[in-house]
């Protein structure tokens, strides 16, 4: 591949990424989510069924992706803001080794589950073509919103989407 072809591809990718980011959230008509099966950092296999009954923010990311890393602190703030509510944030690392993920986590402490997708099989199954891509699932495990590109999860439209999905759940008794 020539430098000109490579630069052309890079430019096209950037134009697509900016357009995707500017497009905001894609609303889905309660689409059933594809299968998700991945190991967490402790080696336990997790599936979407493990999170049934909760709103799920499923974020596909990689440690080499600057926009992914920029939005991670806002996901942590959202987790703190929603403590005690039926929301789970899951970050699925796409196509990296455990060593690469561990090196990243040595620099940034995160309190939400990190799942590993070293062969990229979940990324392909979910048709993720750019990082970060985030799916908001309702408590029944259906995709309701998709966002390609980074956002501040603890404010604005992103927070409103999470709150709207939480509002659909039956009221929880005080704890």
Language-model regions: role of each:
Residues 22-48:
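N-terminal "domain-start" segment that seeds a small globular fold
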Residues 86-98, 112-119:
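Thiol-based oxidoreductase modules, predominantly thioredoxin-like and allied folds used
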Residues 54-56, 60-64, 130:
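Short pre-active-site segment immediately N-terminal to redox-active cysteine/selenocysteine motifs
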Residues 60-77:
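Conserved redox-active cysteine motifs that mediate thiol-disulfide chemistry
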Residues 57-59, 89-91, 135-136:
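Hydrophobic beta-strand core positions in alpha/beta domains
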Residues 103-111, 117-163:
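Thiol/disulfide oxidoreductase modules built on the thioredoxin-like
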Residues 8-18:
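Bacterial N-terminal signal peptides
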Residues 169-175:
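Non-globular targeting/processing and membrane-anchoring segments
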């Amino acid at each position: 591949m020539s430098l000109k072809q490579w630069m052309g591809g890079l430019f096209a990718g950037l134009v697509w990424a900016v357009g995707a980011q500017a497009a905001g959230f894609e609303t889905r008509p309660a689409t059933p989510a594809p299968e998700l099966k991945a190991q967490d950092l402790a080696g336990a296999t997790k599936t979407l069924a493990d999170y049934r009954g909760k709103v799920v923010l499923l974020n596909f990311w990689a440690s080499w992706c600057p926009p992914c890393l920029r939005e991670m602190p806002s996901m942590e703030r959202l987790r703190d803001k929603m403590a005690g509510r039926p929301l789970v944030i899951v970050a699925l690392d796409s196509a990296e080794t455990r060593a690469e993920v561990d090196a990243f986590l040595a620099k940034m402490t995160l309190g939400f589950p990190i799942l590993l997708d070293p062969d990229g099989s979940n990324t392909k199954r979910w048709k993720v073509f750019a990082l970060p891509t985030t799916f908001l699932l309702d408590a029944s495990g259906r995709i309701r919103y998709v966002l390609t590109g980074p956002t501040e999860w603890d404010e604005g439209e992103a927070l409103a989407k999470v709150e709207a999905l939480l509002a659909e759940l039956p009221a929880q008794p005080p704890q």
